[in-house]
Design a protein with these regions (language model features):
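Cofactor-pocket helix-loop regions in the catalytic cores of large enzyme subunits
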Residues: 216
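N-terminal localization/anchoring segments of enzymes in phospholipid and broader phosphate metabolism
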Residues: 1-211, 229-233, 245-368
Length: 368
């Protein structure tokens, strides 16, 4: 992965600066290497992780078992209600427990769909954290087939908030509110509504309100109504929604400022990106939540702010490239139908372009 040099230890690279991995164009190997390093690092005291869907021969589980055997505290929340993976997850849970991991089996009434990993280190300088927040599962197989984003940070603030999230999960609860992370079911939908309101106010000030959203599905009525309100207030909204979409774009006086495309290509589009504002004002998030009522109110989901300038620019580039796609994109019409874009002289296949960019970055880094 160009974001992380696999030839060097991974932990110091994340301590130096935030990292973003884009699957399947970049490999999951650096993340697996990170887990293995954490399992063997004498400074690491604990590894905490939420598991939803795992590969059949999971290197993630191997690393967690190794960590427990090395005397680390390993806390794992395994979601037994993951559809089609219930049996697998029971087996993995037993294996982890036998190795000495502390396993929690989901939360009553909620499905834990968040992708969160927290590594806690204790050195002479004090406690430090490495937190990973993703849009997709810790699964080596699907990381080669689905497009997903994995954000890695050594931010103490994010690490402390992730600690709060795990503390609540361990007690069968969910956090009410933390400052930076958006955590469903209590502080994701309301934060998104606040961000949309922020863009409505920006439009009223003449600052050009803007929202960019990439998700799998859009069914949350409360968020849909707020997007319609934003469109009517003059906020321009770009959306990349692969699957179910209960909002019609381009309806005069209602959603004429909303533009929706669906991208269906070689890889399954699975990443979630939320952008609020433009230029210096823009705020970026990546996370596990679609804008569906089941995600915002009936699941534990987590989205994280991405604040490093280089990573914000990268997310904007990813989003812009998708909007420009004219090979895999279908554009939603006001009647709810979709019309396939036809590539002219300048064909843009966003997935092929991301693959090429990752390849070139890899070649460049291997020459260093």
């Amino acid at each position: 992965s160009p974001a992380l040099d696999e030839r060097k230890p991974i932990i110091p690279q994340i301590l130096e600066e935030d990292k973003l991995i884009h699957y399947p164009y970049e490999s999951i190997r650096p993340f697996l290497q990170l887990l293995h390093e954490a399992a063997c690092d004498p400074d690491v005291v604990s590894i905490k992780m939420t598991l939803y869907r795992l590969a059949n021969h999971s290197k993630v589980v191997d690393a967690l078992v190794e960590a427990a055997e090395n005397g680390k505290q390993v806390d794992v929340l395994v979601e037994l209600k993951a559809r089609f993976d219930e049996e697998n997850n029971i087996e993995w849970s037993r294996l982890l427990e036998r190795a000495g991991c502390h396993v929690v089996y989901g939360i009553e009434g909620l499905k834990v769909h968040s992708k969160l990993c927290l590594i806690t280190r204790k050195t002479k300088e004090g406690i430090s954290f490495i937190t990973q927040i993703g849009t997709g599962n810790y699964n080596e197989k699907t990381s080669r087939l689905y497009t997903d984003l994995s954000f890695l940070t050594a931010s103490k603030e994010i690490g402390l908030e992730a600690t709060e999230v795990f503390r609540a999960l361990d007690q069968g609860e969910t956090v009410d509110s933390v400052k930076n992370l958006l955590v469903a079911p209590h502080c994701l939908q309301n934060r998104l509504l606040n961000r949309i309101d922020g863009e409505i106010k920006a439009a009223a000030r003449g600052e050009g309100g803007y929202i960019g959203i990439k998700i799998n599905s859009l069914t949350d009525k409360v968020l849909i109504n707020k997007l319609i309100e934003a469109s009517q207030a003059g906020v321009y909204i770009d959306m990349v929604v692969r699957g179910i979409c209960c909002l019609r774009a381009g309806v005069p006086d209602e959603t004429e400022n909303i533009h929706i495309i669906s991208i269906v290509g070689r890889y399954l589009e699975h990443s979630r990106i939320y952008i609020f504002g433009q230029g210096e004002r823009a705020r970026y998030y990546i996370g596990s939540a679609d804008w569906m009522t089941r995600s915002t109110l009936r699941r534990v989901e987590i989205a994280a702010p991405v604040t490093a300038p280089a990573l914000k620019a990268r997310l904007q580039h990813i989003f812009d490239t998708m909007l420009a796609d004219n090979c895999n994109a279908r554009v939603q019409q006001p009647d709810g139908s979709y019309v396939r874009r036809m590539p002219g002289a300048d064909a843009v296949d966003c997935q092929a372009q991301f693959y090429e960019e990752a390849y070139q970055a890899n070649v460049h880094s291997s020459l260093k």
